[in-house]
């Protein structure tokens, strides 16, 4: 299953409602699971981004659907990185001439 790294930042609305952040994170985790995925890690962070999560989802379409649904709520903005494991990269690199 593809892995995605999510860099998440609060919007003005999201930070105003910060007391609901754990509830919103749990709802996001449930949405990922309903779509057949799994939240691997999740961290609140200090620095350039407010929250970082790693999720597995069945495919890019599932990822886009989950993240659009998250975005329309207006509490966060996301940057999504599709991640590749060392073994996945090894397969690609082994085919290089």
Named regions from a protein language model:
Residues 1-97:
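A compositional/biophysical signature of low hydrophobicity enriched in polar/charged and small residues
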């Amino acid at each position: 299953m593809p892995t995605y790294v999510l860099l998440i930042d609060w919007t003005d609305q999201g930070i105003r409602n910060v007391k609901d952040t754990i509830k919103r994170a749990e709802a996001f985790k449930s949405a990922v699971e309903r779509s057949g995925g799994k939240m691997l890690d999740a961290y609140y962070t200090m620095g350039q981004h407010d929250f970082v999560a790693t999720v597995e989802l069945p495919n890019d379409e599932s990822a886009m659907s989950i993240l659009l649904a998250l975005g329309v709520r207006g509490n966060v903005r996301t940057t999504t990185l599709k991640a590749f494991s060392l073994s996945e990269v090894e397969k690609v690199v082994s085919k290089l001439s």
